[in-house]
From Swiss-Prot:
Location, primary (coarse class): plastid
One BP term from GO: amino acid biosynthetic process
Record's GO cellular component terms: chloroplast; chloroplast stroma; endosome; Golgi apparatus; trans-Golgi network
Keyword Zinc-finger: no
Keyword Nucleotide-binding carried by entry: no
Binding, a divalent metal cation: 263, 326, 343
Disulphide linkage map: none
Positions contributing to NAD(+) binding: 119, 150-152, 155, 183-188, 208-209, 221, 230, 248-251, 305
Species the sequence originates in: Arabidopsis thaliana
Catalytic reactions on record: 7-phospho-2-dehydro-3-deoxy-D-arabino-heptonate = 3-dehydroquinate + phosphate
Function, in words: Catalyzes the second step in the shikimate pathway.
Subunit relationships: Homodimer.
Subcellular location(s) of the protein: Plastid, Chloroplast
Gene behind the chain: DHQS
Record lineage: Eukaryota, Viridiplantae, Streptophyta, Embryophyta, Tracheophyta
Name this protein carries in UniProt: 3-dehydroquinate synthase, chloroplastic
Length: 442
């Protein structure tokens, strides 16, 4: 293995993860995750598989997997996935109706001043409920809010300044708490504002989309876009907690629902083959918003994300593998225009391109290529980039990707059986060129 290659292996858990039936959850098997191998060669990080060393899910006697989500659940036992970062660890709460339980949110509010950052689509639906949850029985807390325009094209410095304007005009001090109420764009912008305002204030994530609930709200990546590339300006800044109220998905547009599934599918491809097999059996249930299926997918995705972040918070190696399809996908978003495609749509097409390149390199079996294409089509996601994307556009945009090191473009590619991937710059450039020519104009 080359020195600039990181390999992530998957060990299949027990083979009896049955297909989802009705509204009863299938109890999940043990999940196996990678750790750094003691046998690594000098200059090489080799990752092998081991069982998850500590439980990241704290729930009541009955796990969320084993019961219908629409049952009334006690607030004393929500499903909790822990992001283990030492003294900066925080919980991800998962369940239905969590915004109705003010004590769960209030325990993570610091100080008496709160700024809720949301957008003009989410505000009419959940802003009042969130303010009520923050202030109910707690008259000493005052809440300000700033409502931003919705969409990826507004994830920029001009829009970010509106958050700072509101915070400064409201004279918020260092003991205030910022609350991100919305999808990935709001979470990224609010988190970056919290990281920057007065050199850092507390913040809470309340994600309202599948995309944000399974991926962007977890792990502390915050930031904004630049006209030359996506997420080029930002910081790693962890929240106090992530509160996933699955009831917020009831108002999510179908296109946004499908977009979020691209990130769910990603986890199965790079590190959790058994989860991918479950997805193949249950993708229609997820699209239909079956509450039990969604709860399982969200929990399992968060477990995977939390484990990776706990091992590699600042994306020095392992965490980069979570970007399968994102290098191609970010190029699509930048080249086609921010907001023209949803993030998950671009990632889906980018994933197909990464899988195609992996196959051209001889690293995966053709059956994996077919399975990836099939599940993305069933998920109502695109499998090719927009026709306007050209080879030169891909190359020029990918040249400024965050994963470029010393002028070398490093990619996340599949290698070996399903559930295995590498983060590497050691690949035949002709395979990349062939993939770009196959999916875009010369």
């Amino acid at each position: 293995m080359a020195a600039n290659t990181i390999s992530l292996s998957n060990v299949a858990a027990s083979k009896n993860l049955n297909s989802f039936q009705s509204r009863a959850f299938i109890a999940p098997p043990t999940i196996f995750f990678p750790v750094a191998s003691a046998k690594s060669k000098p200059g090489e990080l080799s990752l092998s598989s081991t069982t998850l060393s500590r439980s990241r899910v704290r729930a009541g006697a009955s796990q969320l997997m084993n019961e219908p989500l629409n049952d009334q659940r006690s607030i004393s036992s929500p499903t909790v996935v822990e992001v283990d970062l030492g003294d900066r660890s925080y919980p991800i709460y998962i369940g239905a109706g969590l915004l109705d339980h003010s004590e769960l949110l209030q325990r993570h509010v610091h100080g008496k001043r709160v700024l809720v950052v949301t957008n003009d689509r989410v505000a009419p639906l959940y802003l009042d409920k969130t303010i009520d949850a923050l202030t109910r029985g707690n008259p000493n807390v005052t809440v300000e809010s700033v409502i931003l325009p919705d969409g990826e094209k507004y994830k920029d410095m001009d829009t970010l300044m509106k958050v700072f304007d509101k915070a400064i005009e409201s004279r918020l001090d260092r003991r205030c708490t910022f609350v991100a109420l919305g999808g990935g764009v709001i979470g990224d912008m609010c988190g970056y504002a919290a990281a920057s305002y007065l050199r850092g204030v507390n913040f809470i994530q309340i994600p309202t989309t599948v995309m944000a609930q399974v991926d962007s709200s977890v792990g502390g990546k915050t930031g904004i876009n630049h006209r030359l590339g996506k997420n080029l300006i930002g910081a790693f800044y962890q929240p106090q907690c992530v509160l996933v109220d699955t009831d917020t998905l009831n108002t999510l547009p179908d296109r946004e629902m499908a977009s979020g599934l691209a990130e769910v599918i990603k986890y199965g491809l790079i590190r959790d083959a058994e989860f991918f097999e479950w997805q193949e059996k249950n993708i229609e249930a997820l699209l239909a918003r079956d509450p039990a299926a969604l709860a399982f997918a969200i929990k399992r995705s968060c477990e995977n994300k939390a484990d990776v972040v706990s091992q590699d918070e600042k994306e020095s190696g392992l965490r980069a593998t979570l970007n399968l399809g994102h290098t191609f996908g970010h190029a699509i978003e930048t080249g086609f225009g921010y907001g023209e495609w949803l993030h998950g749509e671009a990632v889906a097409a980018g994933t197909v391109m990464a899988v195609d390149m992996s196959y051209r390199l001889g690293w995966i079996d053709e059956s994996i290529v077919k399975r990836v294409n099939k599940i993305l089509v069933r998920a109502k996601l695109p499998t090719t980039p927009p026709e306007s994307m050209t080879v030169s556009m891909f190359k020029s945009i990918m040249a400024v990707d965050k994963k470029v090191a010393d002028g070398l473009l490093r990619l996340i590619l599949l290698k070996g059986p399903l559930g295995n991937c590498v983060f590497t710059g050691d690949y035949d450039r002709e395979a990349l060129d062939a993939t770009l020519r196959a999916f875009s104009k010369s």
